[in-house]
Amino acid sequence: MKTPLTEAIAAADLRGSYLSNTELQAVFGRFNRARAGLEAARAFANNGKKWAEAAANHVYQKFPYTTQMQGPQYASTPEGKAKCVRDIDHYLRTISYCCVVGGTGPLDDYVVAGLKEFNSALGLSPSWYIAALEFVRDNHGLTGDVAGEANTYINYAINALS
């Protein structure tokens, strides 16, 4: 999994040298943001399920057909609604991992790779998840550097879905 730390070390190792000043700056930058990233991850751990449920309800309001259409990809049944919350929660959980490592590696490895094919095969609309993630970003209640860390990875996921 790629993180700013592993990338700096890999680059130095590839050259067969110690970390350069630029690589050390990247490492120090991560450590300077680490507290905010860990606080963001804690907020996801404490609130992620609640955020996922609220985001799912937002999706149902924005796209009412998702609760009216029949089929496994829709939320017209309790099972369908549970799947929707589960999928949103998966995005949020993976975003929390990004906050911990300080990079997009978890999203790249666990979500982005094959995302378009996966959604297409299951008949899932990326717009549902974009709306859910935008809702979380706009309503999570985080502030300052903590919000900045969380929003960096929420926006990355939104862009990957777009």
From Swiss-Prot:
UniProt PTM comment: Contains one covalently linked bilin chromophore.
Q: What is this protein called?
A: Phycoerythrocyanin alpha chain
Matches recorded under CDD domains: PC-PEC_alpha
Query: Known InterPro entries for this protein?
Result: Globin-like_sf, Phycobilisome_asu/bsu, Phycobilisome_asu/bsu_sf
GO BP annotations listed:
photosynthesis
Q: What is the purpose of this protein? A: Light-harvesting photosynthetic bile pigment-protein from the phycobiliprotein complex.
**Principal subcellular localisation of the protein:** membrane
Q: Which residues bind (15Z)-phycoviolobilin?
A: C84
So what family is this one in?
Belongs to the phycobiliprotein family.
What does the subunit section of this Swiss-Prot or TrEMBL entry state? Heterodimer of an alpha and a beta chain.
